[in-house]
Amino acid sequence: MCDEEVAALVVDNGSGMCKAGFAGDDAPRAVFPSIVGRPRHQGVMVGMGQKDSYVGDEAQSKRGILTLKYPIEHGIVTNWDDMEKIWHHTFYNELRVAPEEHPVLLTEAPLNPKANREKMTQIMFETFNTPAMYVAIQAVLSLYASGRTTGIVLDSGDGVSHTVPIYEGYALPHAILRLDLAGRDLTDYLMKILTERGYSFTTTAEREIVRDIKEKLCYVALDFEQEMATAASSSSLEKSYELPDGQVITIGNERFRCPEALFQPSFLGMEANGIHETTYNSIMKCDVDIRKDLYANTVLSGGTTMYPGIADRMQKEITRLAPSTMKIKIIAPPERKYSVWIGGSILASLSTFQQMWISKQEYDESGPSIVHRKCF
């Protein structure tokens, strides 16, 4: 690692999108869907030199003839063959680098099973022959990106949400809470409530259209009941959206009913607590002496925290739950969609981090379990 010229690669594998690029950059070079698609029917497209699988944007653009699979479910890798395809695509097609020439920083979900970290480590060294690698917890990287080492991160992506209290740079595992409610569930819920309005969206391809509607038009209401009343009495909240075939649909209270499920999971038929209660419960699992620091440094991260109005609503809900004298601050950086990646870029380019890498030599001596000793 003495040769300073070699940039480390930073790869943040999310359930919905993969973010990849070079350490020291301020944004990922490549952002593409974590999707592997396989043809539904053999040889429909004659002379297309049909491949047996497509990854990312190419899978997305050919989605009409493919069956789409997400190898990462709820933040955890469940299909390693497809995951390998995604990494291969990341290195060779997106970043156009030789992985055997660069250290690689990967990210993992909080509470990721030990066997999974070992498998990631094994694939990096044995399949891609990387000279060095490291596995970092996503939420911790988001906190670094906000310039902090202590705080609680609400990280909500496409497949899973976590509340992760972090003290002096270390995640506190006993207080981490996971909520299996995230972007994909909200997309499904929006499909359902749009169907109630008379618009039908059913296929995996149509789900992507609904995801786009969600990202462009949804917002979080500060007061849900009041917003519902406003929507019922006037058309001021209605917006129109043009579908790919040119048909225009109108959406009203669905705009805020969809993300309201984050605060009221009962909308989805789930018995779980909302993101505000989960954050509060996570703080309450921590030592009484550090709670003040967590309340004052509540950091939002991930694509599902991108809804307009979400920070104000969190502030209101947590103020309600916390002791009345407590200072509560919700930090919602504008780049929070990519803050895990940005934190990884910062970490991998620190001079003090260079001795933290797991080297190929250490891996050869100790095997995959080295990851538990060096990454925490």
From Swiss-Prot:
Top enzyme class, one word, equals hydrolase
Domain of life from the UniProt record:
Eukaryota
* One Pfam family recorded for the sequence: Actin
TM region(s), chain numbering: none
Which cellular components does GO assign to this protein? cytoplasm; cytoskeleton
Residue numbers bearing the Methionine (R)-sulfoxide modification: M45, M48
List N-acetylcysteine occurrences by residue. C2
The reactions it catalyses are: ATP + H2O = ADP + phosphate + H(+)
Please give the residue positions where the record annotates the modification Tele-methylhistidine. Answer: H74
Tell where it localizes: Cytoplasm, Cytoskeleton
UniProt keywords (A-Z) are: Acetylation, ATP-binding, Cytoplasm, Cytoskeleton, Hydrolase, Methylation, Nucleotide-binding, Oxidation
Extract the Gene3D superfamilies matched here: 3.30.420.40, Actin, Chain A, domain 4
Q: Which residues carry this modification: N6-methyllysine?
A: K85
Its principal location? cytoplasm
Q: What is its EC number?
A: 3.6.4.-
Q: What else is known?
A: There are at least 5 different actin genes in this organism.
Descriptive protein name: Actin, cytoplasmic A3
